[in-house]
Design a protein with these regions (language model features):
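His-Asp-centered catalytic microenvironments across diverse enzyme cores
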Residues: 42-165
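Active-site neighborhood of thiol-dependent amide/isopeptide-bond enzymes
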Residues: 1-62
Length: 165
């Protein structure tokens, strides 16, 4: 289960949306801020060709975000793309003000589709690993075990693909 622990993301200095959401939730909880792990299925129009080939789809099942309890309500935060990835993909960085949900933009800065939220899977205190594993086994055959998943060099893939644009 190492790939789905906050300490693993800290040690490896990289992760994917699910592991980054786990890290953000752990940090918030350590500071006394209630936090939950949220998941949604999203259609990603801007993923890399290499990732689409590995996944055999551009639907990202169980995309992770973090829900934080601030000022008597739950607010969504998406800790996935760093500023470098946003710049390479032509995306406006997500802003978080503590009042409004901060989820992926539907369009990039050029007006192209970026992210479509297809299905909200709910919010949990811990990652629903078995449910995630079943979905990944069904839709991503041959994908590595979800519990040991770490991010491939997505930043490198983006750099390679965007260099030719």
């Amino acid at each position: 289960m190492g790939g789905l622990k906050a300490t693993t993301v800290l040690e490896e200095k990289r992760g994917w949306c699910v592991s980054k959401a786990i890290l953000l939730a752990a940090c918030c909880r350590a500071l006394g801020i209630p936090a939950r792990l949220g998941y949604a299925d999203v259609l990603n129009h801007l993923s890399t060709e290499k990732l689409r080939q590995r996944m055999k789809t551009n639907v990202f099942y169980w995309h992770g975000y973090t829900a934080l309890y601030l000022d008597d309500r739950w607010v969504k935060a998406t800790p996935a793309f760093n500023i470098e990835l946003c710049e390479k993909f032509g995306l406006k960085p997500l802003e978080f003000n503590g009042r409004d949900d901060s989820i992926y933009h539907a369009f990039d800065q050029a007006g192209n589709r970026h992210m479509e939220y297809l299905h909200d899977r709910g919010q949990f205190l811990e990652p629903p690993i078995e449910a995630m594993r079943r979905t990944f086994d069904e839709y991503y055959p041959g994908w590595p075990d979800i519990s040991d998943a770490t991010e491939a060099d997505f930043g490198g893939e983006v750099a390679d693909e965007t260099a030719t644009r």
